[in-house]
């Protein structure tokens, strides 16, 4: 894959890539698809060289320089050019959806690109190369004759331009690989297809002529990567938009402002996906949004106060036609992230065609100017007459990092050929419109009279709030902020709304949908009225009751009769009036914020059975069934995809005379609906089953293709990671200029732009504990290595060979994991006895751990630590580097879960859960504070600290657990993420060779028809291994199953006296077997409940039995019971284990639920999600570390409240 490289200032020489390891703003942008990255049919844009700023990002005084260079560097290298090939690919997309286009592209390497750009040779004119291209024109003519098509003037101009560029590229690079004057058949065909696509997209005539094309960025409320095409009559702009309808771009908890108290007292889970923004009651809810906003009709999104402190809660607002919604994020950075992503989605939603096209007749251009807004960029400003009738003038801004002057010259020459006279001036009067600071540039003004109006095929919508305000104001706001980063630009809001939504006539009983606001207060009537509360309520109830009864027993309404046509029957419920059907379709999409492709098939009035029957209406669409309540005071909305429905069946209603319908949902409780008649219920059942059959057949047809496509996606190429990298650079720019800068890169099926940081961060992963604590970090390290970063794992010496076998750097810290585990198993949870023994055995070890951790982590750029390691937060404070925590058990204050070391026997509510975290934090800090503060003063040269100043609850936290098992709590702040398991697959077919006796044992169990169960408690230390082994043997024989046994408990610090227990033939002693290889081949698993083992079991989709010994194992024993996939054993003996094994191997409900949970976990990529969060929260983490140093700099005395030496015993 070719890589864009900076060019040297000396002409005629191509430069080698410069080392930019210490510059986080430097990026690579690669093009995927086509050939080696440069799939363009025309001149590729190359990045102008920028001197490296090695340490500038850490210098506060260089903020403005950093802002300019970071934005310039990023957008420059992102201006790769794939537009022509994309247009070509898109032209034949309909005929080749499943396979890439068989295309052998122009073999142009990076050196040829660099040479052409360095010498700065302008494009050769058609007349200069006519002799060279005649053979190619003859070949094209022959091709067209064969296709029975006459060669047009426009096609000739495209081929001539292509030959000229090949000639220039070959001469400047000195390449001898091909004749630079020759086009092969593939390129000739490609040029013809390009002509057809341009003519179709922009409605060009055959008499038009192609002049040139250039990569550029459209400056609007977003920075949109695209391409300008210049013809003899038009200036054309084209950009593909990313298609992310099925991907959740952003999610997290937000506070909502109450309309009555005006306080942000309610937390909801927000999801931004495709064209909608929805709020749910919690992170596990998927079908019942409490708020549903269609982004196509959103007018504006902005921060309410962008000048707040960094880590203070920040309010942003969404303005719709009906009301303004206020949301509070946990910090300014988080609010900016929401605003930036919302603006991108709004822009994409309002340009639903998948691309943005602008067509400007050259005759309508009133003014041209090139302005240098900041270093290494040129901005082309166009003043264009919109129409002769309105005489409105539009401003368009296009940013170039190369060839800006050439673009201006090309436009001038084309206009001159049309007889439009131009004059030059040193600077345009409108230069100051873009920025308050001085700009250098040249301007061209019209003298001739206009003769035709501007034509825009797919224009940027105008007049829709600040998102789609006139481009002049949006561009000036962004660029003005770049020029003056210390000042916050104010953005005007236009109240003009172009979108008109029809009224809904079937919602007399309530307001529209969750996204709408209450009606404005009416003015009080001047007429006297005689009424009482009793009469008013009686009248209201009687009216609504009569309406409800009449609507409930109304007949179904069909809006598509294809089902009855296929059956050869007449549809008695079909709405024959076309206008009524169109209005109903519009209402349906509006209510549930559905795309235009969603079609309403039928609708029914019914009751939805929740706590009480809720009257409403069911809608059957092409891909989902929807419901909305119609009774006053209720606000229930449901959007349920057919793909999540397992079955539908009929039953009697709960009330006399009603007919019931049950919808069975995968991994969710059943839904009950009551209809007023059997006819309506049966009709709904018929339509539902038909759509389910269609959905399943369609899904099966594409499942194999989807699987192959997913298998080919690498970690570094995932959409989520690409978005995270882009968001990281956006965050840096926003932090510098104090304004949101949404950047949209082009993307289509065959070619996408990818941003990568050129700086290789040194990630240090610090952890202590057992093998299960180290294994996830190896998986994360592999992902970071794939991202081209450097990684070092710091842990106990015994894991060194294992870690280094993956090519990961290793460093040692103090401590014996077996002794730590023995302490934990002995005391199980936090207690006085635990503290006493810890004081006796580990007081000296804490000092050794802190010192060895500091020695191993001093070269870190980013530090990720298990909080049990204790040293990381202090090391990050000293080094002023981003610091993250990662763990497998609850460690963050929340009301949803107790602390993993203080899990009660039974659930005791949110207040108790929150209290367990407070208690543990204080006890844990009291136990280590003495050693820690001594180490801080003597080694780190930092002042003493206390629990408050540590600000542990503000540290970005990554939970490497599946959100299916550990759903994010609503009171988690935005920097606490549940990313998914970090699996380390060691048992793949090419890396693990199972012993033959194990395979024979498994095959015999299958032949005998016996369930196969795995039993192993990892590296747990137990006091009496023999007794535990005997209990396992008795339980296996009693349950009549076959067992694969891993007796790890007898190998570590156990009593080695006595004779080893002999195992019966029903049990095979396997030792360590890779879980990813084994668990997919058995029926159930019994283990200790470690996070890694639990995750591997659940991913395999098999039931699990957990016997917890200490720590988070009690937590996961409760979780597997809560989600219905297994059993937690508080006490293990032969009887209890036998009963549990029988239950999980025979209970169909547990088995099916485990399979469903397994599918969900298999669809997750925890490592990819973790790296995405690292990018997203990197800037926040760095600010947090630096803020502590600023605090100490402002303190004149030690604030530590630890007057006595803290220890493990003094609490």
Swiss-Prot record:
Residues 423-432 have a biased composition (Acidic residues). It comes from the Eukaryota. Its main location: cytoplasm. It is an enzyme of class 2 (transferase). It is found in: Cytoplasm; Preautophagosomal structure membrane. The keyword Protein transport applies. Residues 1-10, 507-525 have a biased composition (Basic and acidic residues). One of its GO terms (cellular component) is phagophore assembly site membrane. It catalyses: a sterol + UDP-alpha-D-glucose = a sterol 3-beta-D-glucoside + UDP + H(+); ergosterol + UDP-alpha-D-glucose = ergosteryl 3-beta-D-glucoside + UDP + H(+). The keyword Transport applies. Residues 1-61, 422-452, 500-531 are annotated as: Disordered. Its EC number is 2.4.1.-, 2.4.1.173. SMART domains: GRAM, PH. Residues 196-235, 586-652 form the GRAM domain. UDP-alpha-D-glucose binds at residues 770-771, 773, 1046, 1072-1073, 1075, 1088, 1091-1093, 1112-1113. Residues 248-347 form the PH domain. Disulfide bonds: none annotated. GO terms for molecular function: sterol 3-beta-glucosyltransferase activity. CDD domains: GT1_Gtf-like, PH-GRAM1_AGT26, PH-GRAM2_AGT26. Sterol glycosyltransferase responsible for the glycosylation of ergosterol to form ergosterol-glucoside. Shows also activity in vitro on other sterols such as cholesterol, beta-sitosterol, stigmasterol and tomatidine. Probable sterol 3-beta-glucosyltransferase that mediates autophagic degradation of peroxisomes (pexophagy). Belongs to the glycosyltransferase 28 family. This is Sterol 3-beta-glucosyltransferase. It comes from Komagataella phaffii (strain GS115 / ATCC 20864) (Yeast). The lineage of its organism: Eukaryota, Fungi, Dikarya, Ascomycota, Saccharomycotina. The gene is ATG26.
